[in-house]
Amino acid sequence: MEEGGYAFEVNNGRPTASEFGTTARISSPSLTMSSSFREGGGGGGSKGLTRRRSMKPSFDADNEFITLLHGSDPVKVELNRLENDVRDKDRELSESQAEIKALRLSERQREKAVEELTEELGKMSEKLKLTENLLDSKNLEIKKINEEKRASMAAQFAAEATLRRVHAAQKDDDMPPIEAILAPLEAELKLARHEIVKLQDDNRALDRLTKSKEAALLDAERTVQSALAKASMVDDLQNKNQELMKQIEICQEENRILDKLHRQKVAEVEKFTQTVRELEEAVLAGGTAANAVRDYQRKFQEMNEERRILDRELARAKVSASRVATVVANEWKDGSDKVMPVKQWLEERRFLQGEMQQLRDKLAIADRAAKSEAQLKEKFQLRLRVLEESLRGPSSSGNRSTPEGRSMSNGPSRRQSLGGADIIPKLTSNGFFSKRSPSSQFRSLNASTSTILKHAKGTSRSFDGGSRSLDRSKVLTNEPRSKFPLNQSSEGTSGGGSPNSTKQGDSEKAAGTNNDSVPGVLHDLLQKEVITLRKAANDKDQSLRDKDEAIEMLAKKVETLTKAMEVEAKKMRREVAAMEKEVSAMRVDNKGSDSRTRRHSTNSKGASTTAQLLSGRGSGRMGMTRSTQ
């Protein structure tokens, strides 16, 4: 059965084992696309792999670090979570469809029961009509018997009157004998009495029949009233069933709308993944440019160091030349007249002060580097603790089989894995890397990337393990539910009670209401199914909200990446401009220093010949002691 582009297999309202397999077995386009993204990193994963293989091996760690910081691993985890949610919703949809089939079957059975009840009502009405006709006939017979009784009584009274007349006329001799007159009258009386006895027996039998018919009529009235009550209940149930069918149709339409929204969200996620890949490629290009800038900076620093060395040698040569000149000038003077000129003393003092200032600057730079390294060490220790806690958290929460444990294990691990992407912006915002040399920056970055990559691989394994353990727990929790019948499963989901309590409640209902057992149970089932459908709709709304939040997070990541790219591009432009200015200044300074050294070398040739004859060490020590005094 296919619903909204997804394939399902249903066996008596229970999902088969094919639903719990890998994503490749499901025949939905969106889910297969997400599974390919999990395995190979999307449709363009092979191109990205060939491109990365063609690059230098020295940048592999940096590429892994950049892909990790840009949230590729959390995106996979989020897509896996969304796929699991979609599978759960599909299973719930298949279960609801199986329950709808069961409801339709129960409705058919109810309609059959209603038809049987209507047939019984027709039969009972026919019986009522027959009994009424019998009662009418018996009433007519009773009326006839009463009329005959009255006639017999009138005949008896007439006979008695005739007897009286006979007794009164006995005095006449002309009359016949009384016996001759009484004999036929007595015979008629006997016949009349026999008929009266027969009529009384018939009357008693008719009374018995009327009583039995009245009892049958009362029973028929009771059955008719119960049938009417059942018919009213059936009408109410049919109305409720129609309302529930309307609600089911509304829920199905909402489910279709939610499926469409889910497809749209999946398409948006794919677009965001494509943008993330493009940004990763742009960051890689920016990384090559940054490496080139670092090479220029290193060369510039080497040239600055060479310039400083040349300046120091030049100053030393000037000092030595001035000392030689003072020695040559003081050769013909006495010990008391030998004095160092003021210019030489000032130059030596300036030179020594410059060297002292350089040493102080070096000490300050070393102190700052030590402080920054200590702070970085503390930050990385805190990050390691957080990663260890995140590794312990999913391993402990993966053993739980409840969906609450799943949500609690997914939440913090996702945040901590995403938190790894904030390491470089925090370090650069503190300004520690700007004061250190580029070589030390590169080494510290490599060390931090290696440590974070190790812990991130551990977190990704923990993510996969947690999802698999959760899938297994879902299978274990769904298997015992499928063993129970439909009534018990629906009652267990809505009421949350034990199966024993449900069995006792069903037995009590069956014992209490023998006549109303079928419609009452069906009404309860329909109410419970409506409750479960509402819960499923609420769960789907919550999953859509979670997907919207995940999409917003991805959009924020994309915005931060674009901003970081713009900031890095601006920094690169400024650094390149500064490098060009410094290189031009270095070239001008080098030209001036070369001309000065040539002039100084020509002037100091004569002085160097005389300085070789004298003891340069003693004169240098004397000059130093005088300068310190």
UniProtKB/Swiss-Prot annotation:
The entry's localization annotation reads:
Cytoplasm, Cytoskeleton
Q: Name one GO molecular function term.
A: microtubule binding
Q: Which UniProt keywords apply?
A: Coiled coil, Cytoplasm, Cytoskeleton, Microtubule
In its keyword annotation, does this UniProt entry include Cell membrane?
no
Q: Which residues form a coiled coil?
A: 75-375, 544-592
**Which portions of the chain have biased composition (kind: Basic and acidic residues)?**
578-596
Annotated stretches, region: Required for targeting to microtubules: 257-493
What cellular component GO annotations does this protein have?
cytoplasm; microtubule
Q: Does the keyword Cytoplasm apply?
A: yes
Chain's role: Plant-specific protein that interact with microtubules.
Q: What is the protein name given in its UniProt record?
A: Microtubule-associated protein 70-3
Q: Which organism is it from?
A: Arabidopsis thaliana
